């Protein structure tokens, strides 16, 4: 490993110790490299504003940073183990190409605020993707709720048959859930949308840095004012981002559980397209719902990432090297979470209900609640009506149909009044 920015003259670096210190940083930093380059350009502009760089030096730095970004995208430049991290790689490239101008780029800046600003920009993009995907999932669910509003579906509590429900109700539930997930992700974008660049190692510097310029140039909504809080916010903002992602993957886990049950031979309510299943290496008859099972498992990765960062934050104020480990947590958590969410809209759009199986699973006892409520409307105290309906549950369905039960369910949000217009308005507000 070469290009250690902090190495002092005459001090040897032990290779094993340095390997331990670096960990897998340089691999993880590939996620943040382009954001670090963008922040370096903004920082260079700010240095020119206060006379540290000349216009000519700024022009050379901007050009070389653009070339480095292009080389990274094309694969001509590889961020590998010869560098300690993405920050040293950028400075080494600029120094190699520009000499003293490259050596000036780090004036007024620490790797502490350098990684803060890069991860902050990265988190904004990832959260915006969570919001977009959640809105797409909600859109599919709303469309199917409208189209299948009257399709009878058994309603379950405790995984036991309970009441007559509808596909419309099932879809509307997921629509509202993912609308909330989109809102939460958007709210979290606003939380993390603050610029830490210029706080240096956590105590500011003796330079009049143009932090207002870098805030505007990088598209941040506001300045993160306190250098102390800049360091305190590391991990805290990552936690908030993972919690927003976790809200979506938690619902993903539950919808995947529903589909795992509904596609089983014991239920057989839903048919998945073949591309969402795999086979067995020994049992020729099998079609395994591996996609939804791995979707179901995704939340564990997100929750683990959140727990890892939360445990890292048992620290006093100021920067501590422990926080390096937060990068792996967010990269792995968002990597797994977003990969699963990306597949969900198309899966939901293409799953097929089996109406005959759904209807066959609706038994007489599932009308007992209707019988009890109807008796209460007629003046029988509900608890007495409940007891009578319980005793006669085996005959509660006589003369009744699933469609009739659904048509009578007029409470707001229930089968006869799904209030999809209200949900549609909330969904439209996401686009505003």
From Swiss-Prot:
Keywords: Amino-acid biosynthesis, Arginine biosynthesis, Cytoplasm, Lyase. The keyword Cytoplasm applies. Pathway: Amino-acid biosynthesis; L-arginine biosynthesis; L-arginine from L-ornithine and carbamoyl phosphate: step 3/3. Its EC number is 4.3.2.1. Pfam families: Lyase_1. It is found in: Cytoplasm. GO terms for molecular function: argininosuccinate lyase activity. One of its GO terms (cellular component) is cytosol. It comes from the Bacteria. SUPFAM superfamilies: L-aspartase-like. Belongs to the lyase 1 family. Argininosuccinate lyase subfamily. HAMAP family: Arg_succ_lyase (MF_00006). This is Argininosuccinate lyase.
């Amino acid at each position: 490993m070469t290009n250690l920015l902090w190495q002092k003259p005459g001090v040897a670096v032990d290779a094993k110790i340095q390997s331990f210190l670096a960990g897998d940083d340089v691999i993880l930093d590939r996620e943040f490299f382009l954001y670090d380059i963008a922040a370096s350009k903004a920082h260079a502009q700010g240095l020119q504003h206060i006379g540290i760089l000349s216009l000519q030096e700024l022009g050379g730095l901007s050009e070389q940073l653009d070339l480095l970004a292009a080389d990274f995208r094309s694969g001509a430049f590889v961020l590998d183990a010869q560098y300690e991290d993405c920050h040293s790689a950028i400075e080494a490239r600029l120094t190699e190409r520009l000499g003293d101008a490259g050596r000036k780029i780090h004036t007024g800046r620490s790797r502490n605020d350098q990684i803060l600003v890069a991860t902050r920009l990265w988190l904004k993009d990832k959260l915006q993707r969570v919001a977009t995907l959640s809105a797409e999932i909600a859109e599919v669910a709303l469309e199917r709720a409208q189209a299948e509003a009257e399709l009878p579906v058994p309603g379950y509590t405790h995984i036991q048959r309970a009441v007559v429900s509808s596909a419309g109700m099932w879809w509307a539930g997921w629509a509202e859930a993912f609308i909330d997930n989109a809102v939460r992700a958007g709210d979290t974008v606003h939380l993390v949308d603050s610029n830490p660049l210029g706080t240096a190692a956590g105590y500011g510097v003796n330079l009049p840095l143009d932090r207002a310029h870098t805030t505007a140039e990088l598209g941040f909504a506001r300045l993160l004012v306190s250098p102390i809080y800049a360091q305190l916010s590391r991990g805290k903002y990552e936690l908030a981002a993972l919690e927003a992602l976790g809200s979506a993957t938690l619902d993903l886990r539950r919808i995947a559980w529903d589909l795992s049950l509904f596609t089983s031979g014991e239920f057989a309510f839903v048919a998945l397209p073949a591309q969402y299943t795999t086979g067995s290496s020994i049992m020729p008859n099998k079609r395994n719902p591996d996609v939804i099972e791995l979707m179901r498992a995704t939340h564990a990765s997100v929750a683990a990432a959140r727990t890892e960062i939360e445990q890292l934050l048992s620290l006093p104020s100021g920067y501590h090297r422990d926080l390096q480990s937060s990068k792996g947590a967010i990269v792995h958590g968002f990597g797994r979470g977003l990969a699963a969410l990306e597949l969900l809209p198309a899966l939901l759009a293409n799953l097929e209900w089996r109406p005959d199986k759904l209807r066959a699973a609706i038994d007489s006892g599932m009308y007992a609640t209707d019988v009890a409520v109807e008796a209460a409307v007629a003046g029988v105290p509900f608890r007495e009506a409940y007891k009578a309906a319980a005793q006669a549950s085996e005959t509660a369905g006589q003369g009744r149909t699933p469609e009739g039960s659904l048509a009578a369910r007029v409470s707001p949000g229930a089968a006869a009044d799904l209030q999809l217009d209200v949900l549609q308005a909330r969904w439209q507000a996401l686009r505003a």
